[in-house]
Swiss-Prot record:
Plays a central role in chromosome condensation, segregation and cell cycle progression. Functions as a homodimer, which is essential for chromosome partition. Involved in negative DNA supercoiling in vivo, and by this means organize and compact chromosomes. May achieve or facilitate chromosome segregation by condensation DNA from both sides of a centrally located replisome during cell division. Homodimerization via its hinge domain. Binds to DNA via its C-terminal region. Interacts, and probably forms a ternary complex, with MukE and MukF via its C-terminal region. The complex formation is stimulated by calcium or magnesium. Interacts with tubulin-related protein FtsZ. It is found in: Cytoplasm, Nucleoid. The keyword Chloroplast does not apply. SUPFAM superfamilies: P-loop containing nucleoside triphosphate hydrolases. This is Chromosome partition protein MukB. It comes from Escherichia coli O157:H7. GO terms for molecular function: ATP binding; DNA binding. Residues 326-418, 444-480, 509-603, 835-923, 977-1115, 1209-1266 form a coiled coil. It comes from the Bacteria. GO terms for biological process: cell division; chromosome condensation; chromosome segregation; DNA replication. GO terms for cellular component: cytoplasm; nucleoid.
Amino acid sequence: MIERGKFRSLTLINWNGFFARTFDLDELVTTLSGGNGAGKSTTMAAFVTALIPDLTLLHFRNTTEAGATSGSRDKGLHGKLKAGVCYSMLDTINSRHQRVVVGVRLQQVAGRDRKVDIKPFAIQGLPMSVQPTQLVTETLNERQARVLPLNELKDKLEAMEGVQFKQFNSITDYHSLMFDLGIIARRLRSASDRSKFYRLIEASLYGGISSAITRSLRDYLLPENSGVRKAFQDMEAALRENRMTLEAIRVTQSDRDLFKHLISEATNYVAADYMRHANERRVHLDKALEFRRELHTSRQQLAAEQYKHVDMARELAEHNGAEGDLEADYQAASDHLNLVQTALRQQEKIERYEADLDELQIRLEEQNEVVAEAIERQEENEARAEAAELEVDELKSQLADYQQALDVQQTRAIQYNQAIAALNRAKELCHLPDLTADSAAEWLETFQAKELEATEKMLSLEQKMSMAQTAHSQFEQAYQLVVAINGPLARNEAWDVARELLREGVDQRHLAEQVQPLRMRLSELEQRLREQQEAERLLADFCKRQGKNFDIDELEALHQELEARIASLSDSVSNAREERMALRQEQEQLQSRIQSLMQRAPVWLAAQNSLNQLSEQCGEEFTSSQDVTEYLQQLLEREREAIVERDEVGARKNAVDEEIERLSQPGGSEDQRLNALAERFGGVLLSEIYDDVSLEDAPYFSALYGPSRHAIVVPDLSQVTEHLEGLTDCPEDLYLIEGDPQSFDDSVFSVDELEKAVVVKIADRQWRYSRFPEVPLFGRAARESRIESLHAEREVLSERFATLSFDVQKTQRLHQAFSRFIGSHLAVAFESDPEAEIRQLNSRRVELERALSNHENDNQQQRIQFEQAKEGVTALNRILPRLNLLADDSLADRVDEIRERLDEAQEAARFVQQFGNQLAKLEPIVSVLQSDPEQFEQLKEDYAYSQQMQRDARQQAFALTEVVQRRAHFSYSDSAEMLSGNSDLNEKLRERLEQAEAERTRAREALRGHAAQLSQYNQVLASLKSSYDTKKELLNDLQRELQDIGVRADSGAEERARIRRDELHAQLSNNRSRRNQLEKALTFCEAEMDNLTRKLRKLERDYFEMREQVVTAKAGWCAVMRMVKDNGVERRLHRRELAYLSADDLRSMSDKALGALRLAVADNEHLRDVLRMSEDPKRPERKIQFFVAVYQHLRERIRQDIIRTDDPVEAIEQMEIELSRLTEELTSREQKLAISSRSVANIIRKTIQREQNRIRMLNQGLQNVSFGQVNSVRLNVNVRETHAMLLDVLSEQHEQHQDLFNSNRLTFSEALAKLYQRLNPQIDMGQRTPQTIGEELLDYRNYLEMEVEVNRGSDGWLRAESGALSTGEAIGTGMSILVMVVQSWEDESRRLRGKDISPCRLLFLDEAARLDARSIATLFELCERLQMQLIIAAPENISPEKGTTYKLVRKVFQNTEHVHVVGLRGFAPQLPETLPGSDEAPSQAS
């Protein structure tokens, strides 16, 4: 037998009055005896705190404060502790003989709230020899000890081998450990469970009948049937899920068209835009390529035009240059003509001026003679005037000498003055400022020598002058002629120059005679040279146009070659026209074929899409229509096989469901009629009695009872006889066994157990041999095991059935798809690929276009070559007649030679014309130049100069002679003052002086008159000279101008200049005509270039815009493609058949779909916003986002338990396959899941009956309990009338209320609540929902009413109420109820705890003095019978006979309180035996 766990001791550390006290607890009753305030309640509070460390529940009050809500005077738990670390520990030993110490560490928290900190812990594996006080205290000396903190306690225990210390952060974990180790009777999972446990302990502690427990006895005594509730909840959850699934199916069925519509329109909306963008991208690429080709072609054309323009511009520049040259030549020729004409006029003027000059020359010579005579007369007058002047001077001198003679002093003064005057005059004339009277003699000799030299030179010059006077006139005439011809020169060079000029004049006359023949020869050669230059220009132009230089010898052969080429090119051009027509015809045929293929391509693509879908669905490749028809036959055969297998699996699944339903019957009855018969007979099914048989014992009992394992056990068979008469609604074999259902055993049979079998001796002559069944069904455990295996098998079968059903419907749909394909697409599906042929034709078309382009280029080149050949022939026709001129290389040299000779002859003619007369005059007198006399004028000047020098020297010598002669007079300085007076001589001299002065005046007047006449002669001479010089200068200017003109003014010069001018005018006109043609062609070319440039610029702009658009679209398209590929929707969007629609058709298709989508997503805010964002034409990726959002939305709407795919399109296809099958299966499942109302009533009744039997068993244990007048205590359990009526209606009249239970809108709980309201309309349900009420009605405890009754004296059985009982009777009754609750908890928790553990039982009773001795004895008997421990507190007058008693006395020692404890074990006549460890331990700590 399993021993019950016990509490060994209670240890208090640092409590109020208890420093370190351990109370050993008795196995039955431990009594705490002592006066008021001795510490009994503190000890019990420490026990309760260690048992339930929940501060929200702990509330300690004295019994004298009954009804009070506030704490006691010692402040509850806070007041029972001392400062510092406190402990309360329980030392227990469980059924496994494991010592477990559980407890709490308590510590007061400072503050006004007076809180307490609690930390629960547990110690396992502690040796028996170690006392709890040794763990938590440390002895300091003999009189002092210290309480260890929790961390030190932990370290101390971890150091001990085999000891485990656990600290708990939650009370739930703490109680869980206590429950698992058998310390408490019930698992306290929640705060509600802890509250019930605390209320139980509190009721036990304070005694009496607790209203909190009696009001909720059902919660304390009746276990919660969680299995039944969970079964109902699972059933309802399954039904709810089933119904939700059915509703989802119905919603899906209703949404299927919406799904189809949404997917179809979304696909049309996005795919049309997707394909439109793809088409536009291809079109843009084609346009970009076309623009690039056109751009390349235009650039080539522009380059050709530019080359042409450059050529024409170069030719135009040449013509412009030539025109400038021609204009210059023409202007030069015109100017030359004008110059010739001017020269002729100038020559006439020159001849006229030369005649005038000859006349002026004669007049000038005559006037020179008149002037010479006037000059001679002028010289005579000057001599006479000079003589008169000298006479006046002489007279003045004589007048001065005469005065000197008048008086010596005067004379000396005069002499002195004259000497000074002579000295000053000598200084001035001799230019000797330092001259003195003393040095005058020396200077006189010098100046006399100079006078002599000057006189000799003057005489020599006078002789020379007389000799040169005769030759001067002829030499001057010849010299002037030489100067006129040659220009200024030295006189000594005149003879040589004159001879050279005469010889040159002869040569120049000979050259001048050759001018006319040379001019005619030059004109002829210049004409030939111009023709040669024109031929060279034509040849150079021809070579430039041909791009090659040709020799003159090659031109005739080239002319023939070009004519042959012209003929050949003419044939090629005609042949090219025919070839071009053939190519264009083939191109048109290709275009027509491509159009027909493009019309057929969408039909073929649709057939291929359908064929690909069929191939994907069936995993086969079809190459011909025969493959399709053969596979269709295979599909039909497979469909038949799948239907047969599905039906077989469905039959097996139904059989399993039936077996599960049969085994799931309550009580283990496989026949519902047995339950009704058992209730009718007042018996119990045998299977229900053995419902708790373990799985190991089930085969034995199943074989033991054999066919009678479904028997009904009745108390009395005789009472059943009357019910058997007329009984028809029963199994074929009905077994009835007489026995007490509460104490039934298997002793009714004589059994011999064999190996896996039994032999049952039914009678002496009848045995039954039964083998143990392989699958036993006897007992709940066996049935549950079987049901579990059946459920597993059913899951496999259901999955297989679902798979087969899906395969069947999939096969059927595949058959329908094949049928549609055969009817619609079989005719075109296996034809050749039109797109491949289109690609081939397009490549051929590109080749044809390239060939046409090349052909056009070749033809253009041939035309250009043809035109070039024609131009070359034309040019050669102009060049060939002039080949002889081109071959004449010396023509230019001869022209230059003749031109040089002509220039020389013309120069000679101009020389003869200009200087011929002067040479003729010079020739007879040239000999006078041989002896060139000195220059007459120079000689005259030298003579006059020598005269002046001789005169000056004579005057200087005279002045110095006078100074020398008057050297003595310088000493008469004193006599200068003595001069005065006049004399008569002086007067006479004065008169003569006046006459001389008059004569001088007349001479001067005559000189002045003759000078005026000379001036007139000179003026006439000057006028003639001026006229002659002017004429001479004009003549020189005219000759110089004629020389500057540089033309020969002969008689034929004007005619030649006019002919030359006319020729150049003709060339200039031709050049201007060609230039105008070139300018027009150049203007046209420039216009063409401008057009090409504008076109090129437009093409470049269009190309770059298109390229930028392509690049931009490419980036967006890449994002679109990336998004498409990432989301796997390319197959849905890339619909190739749409590629053949126009952009307008696709845009119209997209717009129509957009309108439909706006209506479809009007109620979906997310899709509506995404759709609105997708309407931006610049953001095509947003349409993909919308398509993905639609797919995601549809994926979220897809029930994955119905349709196993993420693709909404496939989901719709699978949906149609699954919906009908699931609807049928779920409807059947709902019927099977839905438990019948009768079954519910039977389950509740059976549960109520079982609990009533259990309460009856509990009552048997309280029959002998008596307290005072109370003789017995019992629990009365009754079914409430309203609930009993509900059970009757559920079992008997459920057909009348099927509207509730068959409603798909109500769960079973709600239907049950509605039925309860319908049966009890007078009851107010308040604010509770039907679901809540229904769940309460599924709990059997709500069907029962429980009350405690006591058998008191003569009153009999009365309801136990505190007012009807004495205090002791109430305490005893309450304790009886608590014992019943604890026992009920143990029974309830037995299946949750290990089978080898029996939990501790312990209750409290404070203030037990209110019980009499008989009641105390009753408690002791109750504790002994129930193996329960009891801690009671009583005053000192209580003396229990059994158990352990502790005497507690509170003492005060040196202001310190401590409790003195003495422990006694039992009462007897002998002296009480002192328990070990009863001595008072010191209560003080250091």
